[in-house]
Curated annotation (Swiss-Prot):
InterPro entries, sorted: LolA/LolB/LppX, OM_lipoprot_LolB
Source organism superkingdom: Bacteria
Key words, A-Z: Cell outer membrane, Chaperone, Lipoprotein, Membrane, Palmitate, Protein transport, Signal, Transport
Species assigned in the record: Neisseria meningitidis serogroup A / serotype 4A (strain DSM 15465 / Z2491)
Quaternary context: Monomer.
Lipid modification (N-palmitoyl cysteine), residues: C16
Family the entry assigns: Belongs to the LolB family.
GO biological process, any: protein transport
Primary site of residence: membrane
Protein name as annotated: Outer-membrane lipoprotein LolB
Cellular localisation: Cell outer membrane
Length: 193
């Protein structure tokens, strides 16, 4: 009886235990980032203040578009990058442009956000050709940011956590898929309008 109880407890604990994630496999080099679509939640904390929103994100080279939405689905703004640079469209339709997404974010919110690297980090890779370090706990350090990533058993990102000491950004991915081949664009939709 004593052995049956012990075996039952061990089975229960084993069933409830989460297998540790292999930190070495979180950041793997690959030739290129695959196209994807994603949806999820976004949290940003700066100077003790936090903001929350939903996002939908399409990465289909050469165009990358991130929409920031309210919990009810209204679009607060859109950020798009293509070969011609970066642009943002706010909820009122005002368009802002810069040579890079990092420069555009500095102009609009006062912080250089590593937006042009997010798709690479979400794909589980450090930016090629740039110095980086992977800490023992699986955290990537690159461009002055620490980047934590969790993935499902198939390697798809589930969370991406970025911190540069002043700013903390957390993306939680609820859906990830492939974009429709019929939706291929060569430039941001806001440039066409």
């Amino acid at each position: 009886m004593k052995h049956t109880v012990s075996a039952s407890v061990i089975l229960l604990l084993t069933a409830c235990a989460q297998l540790p994630q292999n930190n070495e496999n979180l950041w793997q080099p690959s030739e290129h980032t695959r196209s994807f679509t994603a949806e999820g939640r976004l949290a940003v904390k700066a100077e003790g203040k936090g903001s929350y929103a939903n996002f939908d994100w399409t990465y289909q080279p050469p165009v990358e578009t991130i929409n920031i939405n309210t919990p009810l689905g209204s679009t607060l703004g859109q950020l798009c990058q293509d070969r011609d640079g970066a642009l943002a469209v706010d909820g009122k339709g005002n368009v802002y442009q810069a040579e890079s997404a990092e420069e555009l974010s500095r102009q609009l919110v006062g912080f250089k956000l590593p937006i042009q690297y997010l798709h690479i980090w979400a794909d589980g890779r450090p930016v090629a050709g740039a110095p980086y370090r992977i800490l023992p706990d699986g955290i990537l350090e690159q461009y002055g940011w620490t980047v934590g990533r969790t993935a499902d058993s198939g390697g798809q990102v589930r969370t991406l956590q970025l911190n540069n000491g002043n700013l903390n950004i957390r993306l939680v991915f609820t859906e990830i898929g492939m974009p429709s081949e019929t939706e291929t664009q060569e430039q941001c939709a806001a440039r066409i309008q």
